[in-house]
Amino acid sequence: MPITRMRMRPWLEMQINSNQIPGLSWINKEEMIFQIPWKHAALHGWDINKDACLFRSWAIHTGRYKAGEKEPDPKTWKANFRCAMNSLPDIEEVKDQSRNKGSSAVRVYRMLPPLTKNQRKERKSKSSRDTKSKTKRKLCGDSSPDTLSDGLSSSTLPDDHSSYTAQGYLGQDLDMDRDITPALSPCVVSSSLSEWHMQMDIMPDSTTDLYNLQVSPMPSTSEAATDEDEEGKLPEDIMKLFEQSEWQPTHVDGKGYLLNEPGAQLSTVYGDFSCKEEPEIDSPGGDIEIGIQRVFTEMKNMDPVMWMDTLLGNSTRPPSIQAIPCAP
């Protein structure tokens, strides 16, 4: 036969009246208000024999803990005791007097008068309604669109639909649908695309480069004459260069070279080649160009060695120039 154990409320009253558990005492015995020590196990100075004595006694009373058989688990003891206190219909917590923090943390409870049979029945019916509503809400939350679609697909439909289809009004329905539906214009899709070009304005790097196009005018007859005069003056400039340069042939240790000394004679430098002044002609540059071309042609055909000997044979060494001996 199972052993009947004492219910929590009378067992708790007996523990309070015994004064064996430290911190468990009446605050107001007339109003049945009492306090339970509720110190957190993580705080400094927490003792299992002092702060968890009530929870351990309840675990031993319910048979969930036996000394020597299981290791002490004060955390589980306290959780089980709290759940049992919250499940009691005739005990409620006085939250405005409870202290949940610190080393002197306590919870204050009040014992209510015992319930009658009618009150117990009402309480049970209310709890049953609450549980039913909770299960319904849970089922509604679990239902998904997939389950609804499965339920709809599971319903079978008859193969013969003639029993609930009005055959006489089929043509009228079609005519009404045609009248209601607006006439839609046919959609024509053309594969040809109109040619388009992206307009792009090419700007210069700087605005200072913007110049208008200018066309040079044709040269006049006077300007053309000046150009011909300039071409005729070119040979005269060349002759002046020959006259200004005064190179004299000389030699040092049997080696000849040309020397540019002031006062030298053109005949000694150029030898037998000389240019005679021609009378001025109305068309400048005509005969002068022919004479210069003749001189250069004779110089080109003549042997350069003979030309140098001719130049050096007629020259004398000036007394002002001294030979510089080469270092050994």
Curated annotation (Swiss-Prot):
DNA-binding region(s), residue ranges: 5-113
Record key words, sorted: Acetylation, Activator, Antiviral defense, Cytoplasm, DNA-binding, Immunity, Innate immunity, Isopeptide bond, Nucleus, Phosphoprotein, Repressor, Transcription, Transcription regulation, Ubl conjugation
GO MF entries: DNA binding; DNA-binding transcription activator activity, RNA polymerase II-specific; DNA-binding transcription factor activity; DNA-binding transcription factor activity, RNA polymerase II-specific; RNA polymerase II cis-regulatory region sequence-specific DNA binding; RNA polymerase II transcription regulatory region sequence-specific DNA binding; sequence-specific DNA binding; transcription cis-regulatory region binding
PROSITE patterns (UniProt xref): IRF_1, IRF_2
Post-translational note: Phosphorylated by CK2 and this positively regulates its activity.
CDD domains the UniProt entry points to: IRF
Example of a GO cellular component annotation carried by this entry: nucleus
Biased composition (Low complexity): 141-157
Pfam family, one: IRF
Chain spans, region Disordered: 92-164
Signal peptide (from-to): none
Positions bearing the Glycyl lysine isopeptide (Lys-Gly) (interchain with G-Cter in SUMO) cross-link: K276, K300
Reported regulation of activity: Activated by MYD88.
Any Gene Ontology biological process: positive regulation of apoptotic process
Modified residues (N6-acetyllysine): K78
Subcellular location: Nucleus; Cytoplasm
Summary of the function given for this chain in its UniProt record: Transcriptional regulator which displays a remarkable functional diversity in the regulation of cellular responses. Regulates transcription of IFN and IFN-inducible genes, host response to viral and bacterial infections, regulation of many genes expressed during hematopoiesis, inflammation, immune responses and cell proliferation and differentiation, regulation of the cell cycle and induction of growth arrest and programmed cell death following DNA damage.
Subunit organization: Monomer. Homodimer. Interacts with EP300. Interacts with MYD88. Interacts with PIAS3. Interacts with SPOP.
Entry similarity comment: Belongs to the IRF family.
The name this protein goes by in its record: Interferon regulatory factor 1
Species annotation: Rattus norvegicus
